[in-house]
Structures are given as structure tokens and as C-alpha cells.
């Protein structure tokens, strides 16, 4: 492609609301153009990136035996009502009515459409397993669209849905998709980790996120320094915490503890380590048609992980409870404990199960129990509630967990029966009995990947694309268009590189050399060949964008050098 015939409107001005490098450089480089809140046009460079990523995703999904389909972007609201998500999903789901007052949605995800596609048509276990995918436009009405392509309202996504007769088959497909995703992100040149994750609004029993490590990452992930264990903080686990500190010596005795409302005050009052105290966190749980006060209990030197807590009580949302709401529920703020607690729902962290010699509130102002055994509660009271921290012990190998920042680029789920049961989608098993499908779903943020690549690889001058996925593998810059020999050599090199199957940009614009170099640094293609005065001595300059490393190469050798680097 000749730059003189190309459209890449670069600018020095960053978007006013941009804070992340990907947002700044993709707009400044003319990859995308913002046309509204969270809405972007893809210009030629952006569309080239979108197509290249799509090609890799499609090739690997096809190789895994997944069948491509295309769902309508607009989905019937009736399908979402059948699944139960029409009202539950929240304002992110854009709902609208047609002229006949029928409900429709702009799809942020397509579980309902996928179930409707097979319901009544896939009728026998002999037709299973089945895995279908699409690469299509999605819409999510984000409350605060920001960060450019990382948090837009309209986006391109690859979403796949699998249907199975049994759990073993569902697990095999889940593992196949995990391996397929790893191939995709490896081909795209990304430094990523597959991490255990919360299933969120999609639902299901098990999920993994694929996180690209980046210092500007929006998610906190914990990775073991000794094995492959990694998890989002919302789902992270650890080996059970222990302590060598002496335990309090008492036998479920009630003590007067005036004004000891905090864990620190209680530990100081009894001169014990906070490890032996139990902390109460009181929240208001919001459900579809009601709300109530819920108490969560964790170890005194731990913190509550709110996503885990929300999953434990099945709430749509957890918010802080006011003092009046706490009192109205019959709870005593600062002195709340699980022993003898009644009238409210409560949950206890798994690590406290069976613990002895603990200190907790006595549900009476200015009183605590000492020497409590956390063993007399029903199993359903115990949930994973703790917020795992850096330095905690890996649950797999005993190594230490380290905190990293990551950006989610993919998510795979074992959905189970959630959607098929709700929507009445069944098949006949080997015994002729009707059973709901087991399902999996698998998503990749295709347009988001463009921004993620920039976040993972850039400097203060612009993008630094990896050769595995870039709009152009190299750029040839003619420093002086009046130099006929230079123009002739550059044009011949351009044609030879294209004949090798490379995507090359020939900068033949009538612009100052400084403008051309600034654009090269901003656009970030892996290599630039500068055809200038050195040509008189039989030399050209090769610049590697990553680090802006410069080297002089004989003009007769530049083709073979680039062939070695890029082919």
C-alpha cells in the first residue's frame, strides 16, 4: 500500500477524555474515530487489525471443529424472558419495543439465541456434542463508557455455545476451548494467563478468564510464583491461613468489652493476635423483588471479597447497610457474631470452619465471646468469602501468590443447565428420556484485543505492534521524493517484499521527513527502512520499532535481512 493513496489521519492532539495509551494512540494514529459515547468507527488501519485478529480467531475455532453461524444482533425480548434475564440483567441490556409493542434487545451476549437455535431441532444424544460460534457486533449500554475500545458500548466479539449430553463431554469441550484460546493468544504475540474466575451475569458452575498482563490492567490477578495457578481476585483461593501466635484461653466465656468495636480494639483488649478474632461485615442484599440485611463473618485479619459474598447469598447487588438498617435488623454494630445469631441470614468463611479458641461479638453491646468453636453451624452457612492477598500461600503447590494487573480478553464458562432448563430445551438420551442440554459458552473480545495489544506494547511515542499481528509488517520511508534513485530503489524493494507475501506500507507522501518519522513512531509498525542519503554509499537504515534500534544495512542485503526477520 502506498501511503499517498492510504487514509490514516494522524494527529498530535489526544482525545480530551483519554487516559490510557491505547485510547490516545489509536485515535491519534487514525485507527479509530469516536462518534459518540462508547461508539467508534474503524478506519482502514483499525479495520485491518480487526480483520487480522478475526482471521486468527476463525482459523483456530475452525480447526477445533466449531461451526460458524451468525445470529441477529437484535434478539426477541421473549427469549430473554424465558431465560429469566430480561429483568435481571440490568440497564446494560438495551431494551426497546417495535411499532407493535413487542419487546426486543440489542444483544450483549447470545445464550438465549443459541438455545433457541437448537431447541426442538437437536432432539437426540446422537446429534451431540455441538459447538457453534459467531464473530459479530454486540451492544452493552455501559453506564460510563471509557478507556476507548476497552470499555465501549458497541464491540465485536467472538462468542461460542456448546451443547452436551453429559458433564464429561462438557468438560472435554471446555478443555479444548481453553487450549484453543491459548493457541489464539499465542499467535497474536500476547503475554497472557488463564485464570480462575467468577462467572458473573453469564452464570454457570466454572469459568476461566484469559488475562493479558499489562501495567494498566483493570483487573487484579493473583499468580503463583512456583506453579501455573492464577486467579482473578474475585475467585482466588489460597491455602488455609495459620498462625504461631498463642490462642486465647477460655471456654465460650462472655466478657465485658466496653467500646471495643473494632478488630484492632478487641485484639488489644485481650492481647491476642487478630488471627483469633472473627470480623462481622454487614451488607444490604438487593434481590429482584426484595432486599434484606445479611451478615458475613471472616477472620479478623482478613477482608471480605464482595463478589464472593454476593454469590454466597445470591444477591443481584450488595450495598453498605446504614446504622438504622443494622439496628432495625436486630444487630448490634461492633458486637455482632455468629453464635446465637437469629433473625438474619448470615454466612461464615470456609477457613473458620472447625476453628477453636476464637473471639467474636456476643450480639450484645459491649460484650464478646472468648473461646468460641466454629463447628456447630450447618454446612450451608460456610462459603468462600475471603479476599486473597499477595503473599498468601498457593492452594495448589504451597508457593507464594503475587499480584499482577491484567486485561480480560477471553472468558470460557461451564454453564451447566442454567439456560437449557429455563428455556425448556431438551433432547432424548440413550434411554429415550428427555433431558436438558448441558452447555458451555466461550467469548473473546475481538475489537477489545486491538486496544489490549497497545496496552501491552507501547512507549511514550506510540504503538509498538508485534510482528505476529500488525497492520503492516514494515514501512519503507523515502526521505526525499526528488531523489529519483531513492524512489526507484524504494519502489523495487516494496514490490519485492510484497511478492514475499508481506504487508508493506510505502511512505511516498510529499511530507517532511520529520513528519514521516513521527508517524512511523506513532503507528508502530515493527520495522522501517529509511531510504535516504546513505543510498549513495549502497546503504539503507533499518529501524526496529521496539526500542527504536537503528542499524545500517547494505542495500543489496536488506531484502534477505527482512525476509529472515518477518518470513
Swiss-Prot record:
Assembly notes: Homodimer.
HAMAP family membership: Pro_tRNA_synth_type1
UniProt family annotation: Belongs to the class-II aminoacyl-tRNA synthetase family. ProS type 1 subfamily.
Name of the top EC class for this enzyme: ligase
Reaction(s) the record says it catalyses: tRNA(Pro) + L-proline + ATP = L-prolyl-tRNA(Pro) + AMP + diphosphate
Cellular component aspect of the GO annotation: cytosol
Pfam families named among the record's database cross-references: HGTP_anticodon, tRNA-synt_2b, tRNA_edit
Primary gene name: proS
Protein name per its UniProtKB record: Proline--tRNA ligase
Species of provenance: Campylobacter curvus (strain 525.92)
Amino acid at each position: 500500500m502506498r501511503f499517498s493513496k492510504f487514509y490514516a489521519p494522524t494527529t498530535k492532539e489526544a482525545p480530551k477524555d483519554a487516559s490510557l495509551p491505547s485510547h490516545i494512540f489509536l485515535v491519534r494514529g487514525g485507527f479509530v474515530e469516536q462518534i459518540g459515547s462508547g461508539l467508534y468507527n474503524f478506519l482502514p488501519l483499525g479495520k485491518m487489525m480487526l480483520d487480522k485478529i478475526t482471521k486468527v480467531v476463525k482459523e483456530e475455532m475452525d480447526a477445533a471443529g466449531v461451526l460458524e453461524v451468525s445470529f441477529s444482533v437484535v434478539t426477541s425480548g421473549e427469549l430473554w424472558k424465558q431465560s429469566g434475564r430480561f429483568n435481571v440483567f440490568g440497564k446494560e441490556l438495551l431494551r426497546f419495543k417495535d411499532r407493535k409493542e413487542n419487546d426486543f434487545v440489542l444483544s450483549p451476549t447470545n445464550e438465549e439465541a443459541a438455545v433457541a437455535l437448537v431447541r426442538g431441532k437437536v432432539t437426540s444424544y446422537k446429534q451431540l456434542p455441538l459447538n457453534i460460534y459467531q464473530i459479530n457486533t454486540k451492544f452493552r449500554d455501559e453506564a460510563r463508557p471509557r478507556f476507548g475500545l476497552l470499555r465501549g458500548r458497541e464491540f465485536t466479539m467472538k462468542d461460542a455455545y456448546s451443547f452436551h449430553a453429559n458433564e464429561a463431554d462438557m468438560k472435554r469441550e471446555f478443555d479444548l476451548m481453553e487450549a484453543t484460546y491459548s493457541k489464539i493468544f499465542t499467535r497474536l504475540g500476547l503475554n497472557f494467563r488463564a485464570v480462575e474466575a467468577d462467572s458473573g451475569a453469564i452464570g454457570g458452575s466454572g469459568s476461566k478468564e484469559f488475562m493479558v498482563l499489562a501495567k494498566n490492567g483493570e483487573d487484579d490477578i493473583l499468580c503463583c510464583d512456583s506453579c501455573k495457578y492464577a486467579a482473578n481476585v474475585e475467585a482466588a483461593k489460597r491455602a488455609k491461613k495459620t498462625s504461631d501466635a498463642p490462642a486465647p484461653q477460655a471456654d465460650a466465656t462472655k466478657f465485658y468489652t466496653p467500646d471495643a468495636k473494632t478488630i484492632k480494639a478487641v485484639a488489644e483488649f485481650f492481647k491476642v493476635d487478630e488471627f483469633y478474632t472473627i470480623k462481622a461485615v454487614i451488607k444490604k442484599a438487593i434481590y429482584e423483588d426484595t432486599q434484606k440485611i445479611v451478615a458475613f463473618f471472616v477472620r479478623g485479619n482478613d477482608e471480605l471479597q464482595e463478589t464472593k459474598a454476593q454469590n454466597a447469598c445470591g444477591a443481584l447487588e450488595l450495598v453498605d447497610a446504614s446504622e438504622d438498617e443494622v439496628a432495625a435488623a436486630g444487630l448490634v454494630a461492633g458486637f455482632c457474631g455468629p453464635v446465637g445469631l437469629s433473625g438474619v441470614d448470615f454466612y461464615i468463611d470456609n477457613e473458620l470452619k472447625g476453628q477453636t479458641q476464637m473471639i467474636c461479638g456476643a450480639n450484645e453491646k459491649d460484650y464478646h465471646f472468648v473461646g468460641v468453636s466454629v463447628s456447630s453451624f450447618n454446612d450451608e452457612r460456610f462459603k468462600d468469602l475471603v479476599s486473597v492477598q499477595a503473599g498468601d500461600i498457593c492452594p495448589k503447590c504451597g508457593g507464594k501468590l503475587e499480584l499482577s494487573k491484567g486485561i480480560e480478553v477471553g472468558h470460557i464458562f461451564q454453564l451447566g443447565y442454567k439456560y437449557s432448563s429455563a428455556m425448556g430445551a431438551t433432547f432424548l438420551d440413550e434411554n429415550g428420556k428427555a433431558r436438558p442440554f448441558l452447555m458451555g459458552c466461550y467469548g473473546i473480545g475481538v475489537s477489545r484485543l486491538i486496544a489490549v495489544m497497545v496496552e501491552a506494547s507501547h512507549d511514550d511515542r506510540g504503538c509498538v505492534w508485534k510482528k505476529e499481528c500488525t497492520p503492516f509488517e514494515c514501512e519503507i520511508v523515502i526521505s526525499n521524493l526528488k531523489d529519483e534513485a531513492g524512489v526507484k530503489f524504494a519502489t523495487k524493494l516494496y514490490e519485492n517484499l510484497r511478492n514475499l507475501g508481506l504487508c508493506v506500507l510505502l511512505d511516498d507522501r510529499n511530507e517532511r521527513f520529520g513528519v514521516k518519522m513521527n508517524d512511523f513512531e506513532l503507528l508502530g509498525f515493527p520495522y522501517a527502512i529509511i531510504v535516504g542519503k546513505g543510498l549513495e554509499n549502497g546503504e539503507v537504515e533499518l529501524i526496529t520499532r521496539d526500542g527504536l534500534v537503528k542499524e545500517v544495512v547494505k542495500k543489496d542485503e536488506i531484502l534477505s535481512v527482512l525476509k529472515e526477520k518477518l518470513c
